[in-house]
Structures are given as C-alpha cells and as structure tokens.
Amino acid sequence: MKIVYIANIRFPTERAHGAQIAKTCESFVQNGSKVSLWVPRRHTNISEDPVSFYGLSARFPVQRLFTIDSVAWGRWGFFLESVLFAVSVFLRARRTKADVFYCRDEMVVAILCLFGAPIVWESHTGAWGLVGSFAARRVRRMVVISHGLKTFYVEKGIAAPSILVAPDGVDLDAFKARSSKESARTRLGLPLDAKVALYVGGIGSEKGTDVVFTAAELLPREMTMVIIGEGGEKLETLRERFPHVLFVGARPYRELADNLAAADVLVLPSTAQNIVSARFTSPLKLFAYMASQVPIVASDVPSIREILDDETAFWFRADDPADLASVIRRIFDERERAAQKGLHASQKVHYYAWNVRAKKIIDFLSTDFS
C-alpha cells in the first residue's frame, strides 16, 4: 500500500505529536507499506536528522511543501499558514498516485475532498467546526485515538463502522536495554537518595500540571517532584515560580526510556476541566510510562480509564493536588503493591506497540481501498 502521510507541523519538532507521526510512518514502513511524509516548509531549531532525533530504524522520504511560516503571528497567522499549506498539498496531490492520503489536519482533509482523493483522517481532538464537520462527513474512513472520540463523532452522525479506534503507542525496543535508576539520575543531575515522582511532557493548565506543582508543596522533604519537558526562557520562569519542583528541562525523545528509569513514581495529571484531556486524549507518555514498569499515579478521567485499570495504576481525583500528594505518599508506603501494578502495566502495554497499531490501521484501510 502506498501511503502519503500529511501533517501540518514543524518537522522534526520536540513536541509529542512529532514523535507520534514519525513512529507511525516508521511502523507503516515496517508493515510493508511505501510511505512519504508531507510537511510544510517551516523553520525549526532542530538541525538533527529525523531518523536520529526520533531514534527511527526505518527511513521514509520527507517532502517539504510551500507555505508562509506565519504561525508565530497568532491565530490568524496560523490560519494563513494552514490554508497555504493545504493548497500546496492539493496541488501536489493531484499529481501524485497513492492508495491513501493519510491526514492529521481537517483543513487539508477538506481541500483534498474536493477532488475525490482516497482520504483517511486521523483525528485527535474532536474537531467539529465548519471545516471539521465538512471533512468528517466526506472522508471514507476515520482513525481516532480513543473510544471517547469515536462516540463524539458517532453522536454527530458519522457512521460507526467507518471509524477505527487506534490509541497511541510506544516503541518497546527502546525499553529493552534502558539505564539503571542510578545512571539515569546521575545523567539528569537528580539526587541519588531522593524519592522521585516524575512528570514528562508539556506544561500548562490543559495538561494538568498546575495540580502537580501544588501537590509538590504537600510532599515530605525526602520526596522530590521532577519535571522533564520545557526549555529556554520558560524554564527559568518556572524555576523561579516553583522552587519546590526540580525542572530538568527539555530532553530529546530518544532519551525517553532512559529518563523514565530515574523515577520511583510516574505522574499522569490529566485535567477533567478540558474535554480533550478528559474524554479524547491518548497521551504518548502514558504508554511509555507503562513500558517503563515504574508505578503510575494517574488522574481518574475516562480517557485514561480506557487504557489503565485498577491492576495497572494508582488513581487520584482529577484536579485535586491534595489527593495526588496523598496517593504518591501511599505508593512509597506500599512498595510491593506498587511494583506489582508496574509489572502488570508493562505486560499490558504490548498491545499498544507502534507496529501493532500500524498493522491494525493498514488492515482497516485495506478493506476500503484494496
């Protein structure tokens, strides 16, 4: 199967969606498909080759299409960039033979629908404005990352059989020879004798990290809350505002497995105040956490309950920092039970390997485009 994967992102990027797209393309290739990735021609501070940056074992061509890099101008700048990129995609697609145009962006989907291309839309956020509803009603198939998202689209009138639920995944090979806890902490500059609760990912209220910062103040002195995931000027501001939190900064995606080895507890603080977080999301960090075999404390929201259960995680009340701090303390008091949950999570995560996900998607597409 020849797949053209289209994504309106900087590439490579330090953000999680870049890793998700790179790993999906790699897994399509490993499952026998011929893949080309189309992205906009945008500036990135990352000079490293995507294969090295993401730790890929399979190559695929990356085509960079014309747009104006106006995202930094704000909402209208992003709209301008998106429209121009979609037009570039349309012009290129008309000259390109492919079995599937696999898209992440509703603007691109909507424009490609105008000439009847075989389009699949992978939706992550429940887009349903003027463009999103037009796109969803006209694509042949949709891939979504949670059952909550599928329910959302079915309630909007999209036929359930045309929607595949394929949660995000993890590269299990990266966890086969990961660092020891001591070497991981030494490399990251973390105290060797501390009890470490670690969060990896973006920072913001929509990520639930406000709860993490407040919970850190409620932990005993021997417990350290560590954050990996921000750099530059924002990092210094965060260190000043939250001196009780240890901010490591941004680290390359390829280090993820080794970095998680530094933790005694991994924190997943999804907020219930945001519908994407509460019902739709499928965080990459979740599956990496599971593969690490480190005990997980997770916010009790429906999107995370789709993957984790009482055998694989400890739960805290969403948006409740006192409860988060209490559960973290309990994990250290119940080490044997915590280790058992970590083991169960690492066994369950094999169902979410990238290559398993890719095969599931290809099988789904083959019934429509073969």
Residue ranges and their predicted role:
Residues 310, 314-321, 330-335:
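Conserved acidic donor-binding segment of nucleotide-sugar-dependent glycosyltransferases
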Residues 265-268, 288-291, 295-298, 305:
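Short hydrophobic beta-strand element within catalytic cores of glycosyltransferases
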Residues 148, 169:
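Carbohydrate-associated surface elements
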Residues 260-279, 294:
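Acidic donor-binding loop of glycosyltransferase active sites
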Residues 235-260, 265:
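Nucleotide-activated donor-binding/catalytic signature segment of Leloir-type glycosyltransferases, i.e.
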Residues 4-6, 191-207, 213-217, 226:
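Conserved donor-binding/catalytic core segment of Leloir-type glycosyltransferases
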Residues 186, 330, 337-351:
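A short, well-ordered alpha-helix in the C-terminal region of glycosyltransferases
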Residues 7-15, 27, 31-84, 92, ...:
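N-terminal strand-loop element at the rim of the active site
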